[in-house]
Amino acid sequence: MDRPQNVKDLARKVKDNLSFSREVRGMDFEKEWDFMAIMRSFETMGFQGSNLYRAVEEIERMKNSKIFFGCTSNIISSGLRDVIATLVKRRHVHVLVITGGGIEEDIIKAFKPTFCADFRLDGAELRDNGLNRIGNLVIPSENYEHLESWLNNIVNDITEGYTAERPRILTPSSFIRILGERIDDESSILYWAAKNDIPVYSPAVVDGSLGDILSFHPRRKMLKLDIVEDVYRINCETIFCGETAAIILGCGVVKHHILNANLFKNGLEHCVLINNAQEFDGSDAGASLDEAVSWGKVKPGTRGVKVFGDATILFPLLVGATFMRKDKDVPKGE
């Protein structure tokens, strides 16, 4: 190869079979603007801004589908609990999958607050003061004491008349339904799920304080949680169903549980993921949607999207631009 003499030589264009027409453009704040104008500007922003716009389009496409919503416990610890509760209250989502920590966080917040703090607080100092840090949030240990007292009373009630030899058998989703019916607080996700008959699945429900409290309870042998029956139930949520869709904040067990259930109908038609996990360690948490296609959990040719970023920033924008919008001049997902 000859030594390049100019920029044209360096560029070395030898083919002409690719073309692009959509120019990169950002928000023009010198023109009249509103929230939806900002959201529409993400289409040509590039990087995760453009993926966020694609997520808006995908949610528009899924609105007539059965929507599975999943999230991890830290999502419920944050202010996103209020956003999710609104979606459940208005029946915008139809099946929930939440980690055990998320179940207990929702219950606790119905009685006691979580506080904003700082990522850099000293762990030992927090421990001595009876405070537990979740990122830049803190939860007083006394909140868990209140949860224990509340849950113990419920276990006493629901195991009345049962024995260790003939225990009461509940699926985790049935148990969670009972908890939701006992909550008298409209800020709660479980409250609205029970009220609107929206199932809440939690395959790892005992991985956290709920499991600890149940294990401490003197009547623990009188209550059995049937996890296998719940796997059957969530799989049946998809069989013979029309179009299904998923919105998943975070990853791990909630992501796999939703995607695996949709394997039983040959895959989701629509999907939006928001997380920061990478696929390079082979984990399901970081796996791309295309990998899910290879397992039959997402249908080929779908326009699902994964947005890399912090759900506490991204999800309120998505909800405001789709489920809760007032401005109708938005993408129709076509």
Curated annotation (Swiss-Prot):
Keyword Amino-acid biosynthesis listed? The answer is no
E.C. numbers: 2.5.1.46
Assigned keywords, A-Z: Hypusine biosynthesis, NAD, Transferase
**Active site, UniProt feature:** K297 (nucleophile)
Residues that coordinate or bind NAD(+): S73, N74, I75, I76, S77, T99, G100, G101, E105, D207, N276, A277, D310, A311
The metabolic or biological pathway listed in the UniProt record of this protein is: Protein modification; eIF5A hypusination
Report the protein's function: Catalyzes the NAD-dependent oxidative cleavage of spermidine and the subsequent transfer of the butylamine moiety of spermidine to the epsilon-amino group of a specific lysine residue of the eIF-5A precursor protein to form the intermediate deoxyhypusine residue.
- Give the family per the record: Belongs to the deoxyhypusine synthase family.
**What is this protein's record name?**
Deoxyhypusine synthase
In which organism is this protein found?
Encephalitozoon cuniculi (strain GB-M1) (Microsporidian parasite)
Its taxonomic path starts at:
Eukaryota, Fungi, Fungi incertae sedis, Microsporidia, Unikaryonidae
